Amino acid sequence: MITRQGNSFLQISPASRRSIKEQREATIEVLKENNPYYLARKLVSLYFLGYHMIHIFPKENNRLTSDQREVIKDLVRRLLMGTEIIADSASGMTLQVLINLLDLSVDAAFKRMILIAKSMHADVMLALMENNIELAREVLKSDDEVDRFSFYIVRQLNIAIKNEYLLSEIGLQDSRSCLGYRLITKFAERIADHAVLIAKELIDSKRPVNLDTVKRITAMSNFALGVLDEACLSMFKQDYNSADKAIEKAREIDYLEKSIMNGLSNLRNMNDIYRVKIITENIRRVAEYSSDIAEIVLNMTVQQTLKKG
């Protein structure tokens, strides 16, 4: 099997070999006084860069502190998809990324990410309707799953952009798509974050919102998620016209928000009005980020609209 690696190299490998595995290793040397979250940030950076094996060793014959080890284990469990701790002691830790580059395409990971984000918004609307604090807390937990897929996508893009042959293998057309997908992934993360903010507002206030108002808020949320669906569909289809329609539709969210706020004239409690304003602002941001996704699709597909001379 002959495989292209970039523009200047060919790799010859047995025909049975279906994937390219460049086993890259990195070592993090740790001082006892290093903040555990300093290590976590460095570990995430190495994961993004595509390393398969990451060793974490203490410097100067010291030991890893229990806090350092716990933060690393928590990070691996919650956010680093496909990563296992294969050695763990006070004298050092070794992490291995076991997931294959071709096991899960960028498109498939993004679809899963969007489904979770949409479920978070549906759940937080139900939590508002029922004043269900436990369900709101479940929304907070779901945010880690969105981040896991986001981290995975960034890792895949960083690996693929160094080897253009792999782009099509993970579901991308060309290297230009990598930047677009990176931005789109960030917007999807933000959409999930706004579900978290609504959930936190409910948890902190512990007071129900007027039922009629919640119904109108839910309708606004469903509209915003409809814009998200159209924007994502335009991305998967690489359809310029569909993306343009999603952007136009997103503009209607301002009318829905104003309609809800104008309907609060009978409320006397300013805290209740402020709560509704916070919730509707978060929903509006969902429509705006969905419009941003569609805008990226326009940039990625605009050449489709040009006349061929």
Feature map (PLM): residue ranges:
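Cytosolic, long alpha-helical scaffolding segments
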Residues: 1-309
